[in-house]
């Protein structure tokens, strides 16, 4: 049979166990539900995490002696307090600390006070600095724009100068070619005339030299211009040519424009200068229809006959 003292000891142990469990649960609930009033208390929670449960326990128990705390509950409370302190510390660091030289060309913001506000003096300096930076950027942009416009105008000027130069060179080339072509034609005409003037004497043809041919052609033309009205037979005799050869030479000169005049059906050549020919044409246009007699009479005053008489021309 079990004695009464055994029941007494069991009851005391049971009561002590109940009290221990009750106090442990109260401490855990107090550690979990304690509010954090501000950021400074949360930042310091990691430092006082160890002393806070001890002070709460001393206030609850008063003068009662300390007892052994439950190791598991204490570790959990400390871990929670440290976790809260670390999270709050990261938030504070994120608000107040700026990474140095995150990106080249970005200025550091002004220092933030613990209250999160910027001082008026610091703010004014920051605004002035930003204004100077904006002004520098605007001036730099303006300089770049001026450089771009100047480069564009210079390129346009060079392009225009090149176009004018090419145009001038093309014009000079065309003039040079035209002069060369004119000289070539004149030389060919001269060669034709030179080959045409052949002195035939006693059935023997003798080709003149270049100097003789040129002198002969000049003499031939001057004789006609001086005579104004010349018989083709007399001209051929004077030049030492056959009559048909003289007629052919005159026709060649008329075609080339060296001489101007007419050959009538009586074997005469009448030389008329371009000015006299224009005067006759003007007379015909003014009178309208003109007879041969009227034209012959007008020719006496419009055409200078030289040494020959007008009667010779009309004859």
Swiss-Prot record:
Function: Component of the UFM1 ribosome E3 ligase (UREL) complex, a multiprotein complex that catalyzes ufmylation of endoplasmic reticulum-docked proteins. The UREL complex plays a key role in ribosome recycling by mediating mono-ufmylation of the RPL26/uL24 subunit of the 60S ribosome following ribosome dissociation: ufmylation weakens the junction between post-termination 60S subunits and SEC61 translocons, promoting release and recycling of the large ribosomal subunit from the endoplasmic reticulum membrane.
Protein name per UniProt: DDRGK domain-containing protein 1
Glycyl lysine isopeptide (Lys-Gly) (interchain with G-Cter in UFM1) cross-link, chain position(s): 268
Record remark on domains: The UFM1-interacting motif (UFIM) specifically recognizes and binds ufmylated RPL26/uL24, resulting in stable association between the 60S ribosome and the UREL complex.
PTM comment: Ufmylated; conjugated to ubiquitin-like protein UFM1, probably at Lys-268 by UFL1. The relevance of ufmylation is however unclear: as DDRGK1 acts as a substrate adapter for ufmylation, it is uncertain whether ufmylation is a collateral effect of the ufmylation process or whether it is required to regulate its activity. Ubiquitinated. Ubiquitination probably triggers proteasomal degradation and is negatively regulated by UFL1, the enzyme involved in the ufmylation of DDRGK1.
Origin species: Mus musculus (Mouse)
Region (Mediates interaction with CDK5RAP3): 1-115
Sequence segments annotated as region (Mediates interaction with UFL1): 217-315
Gene: Ddrgk1
Coiled coil: none
Span(s) of short sequence motif UFM1-interacting motif (UFIM): 196-210
Lineage, uppermost ranks: Eukaryota, Metazoa, Chordata, Craniata, Vertebrata
């Amino acid at each position: 049979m079990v004695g009464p003292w055994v029941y007494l000891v069991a009851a005391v142990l049971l009561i002590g166990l109940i009290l221990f469990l009750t106090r442990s649960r109260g401490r855990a609930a107090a550690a979990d539900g304690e509010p954090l009033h501000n950021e400074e208390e949360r930042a310091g929670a990691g430092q006082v995490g160890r002393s806070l449960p001890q002070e709460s326990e001393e206030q609850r128990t008063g003068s009662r002696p300390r007892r052994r705390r439950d190791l598991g509950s204490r570790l959990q409370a400390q871990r929670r307090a440290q976790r809260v302190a670390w999270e709050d510390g990261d938030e504070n660091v994120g608000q107040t600390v700026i990474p140095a030289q995150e990106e080249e060309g970005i200025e550091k913001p002004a220092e933030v006070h613990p209250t999160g506000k910027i001082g008026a003096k610091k703010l004014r300096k920051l605004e002035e600095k930003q204004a100077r930076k904006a002004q520098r950027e605007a001036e730099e942009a303006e300089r770049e724009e001026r450089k771009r416009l100047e480069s564009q105008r210079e390129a346009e000027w060079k392009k225009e100068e090149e176009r004018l130069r090419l145009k001038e060179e093309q014009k000079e080339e065309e003039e040079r070619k035209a002069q060369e072509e004119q000289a070539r034609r004149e030389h060919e005409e001269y060669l034709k005339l030179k080959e045409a003037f052949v002195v035939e004497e006693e059935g023997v043809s003798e080709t003149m030299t270049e100097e003789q041919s040129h002198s002969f052609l000049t003499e031939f033309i001057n004789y006609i211009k001086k005579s104004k009205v010349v018989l083709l037979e007399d001209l051929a005799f004077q030049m030492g040519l056959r009559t048909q050869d003289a007629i052919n030479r005159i026709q060649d000169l008329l075609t080339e424009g060296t001489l101007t005049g007419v050959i009538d059906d009586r074997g005469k050549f009448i030389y008329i200068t371009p000015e006299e020919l224009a005067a006759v044409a003007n007379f015909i246009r003014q009178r309208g229809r003109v007879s041969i007699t009227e034209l012959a009479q007008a020719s006496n005053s419009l055409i200078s006959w030289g040494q020959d008489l007008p009667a010779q021309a009309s004859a």
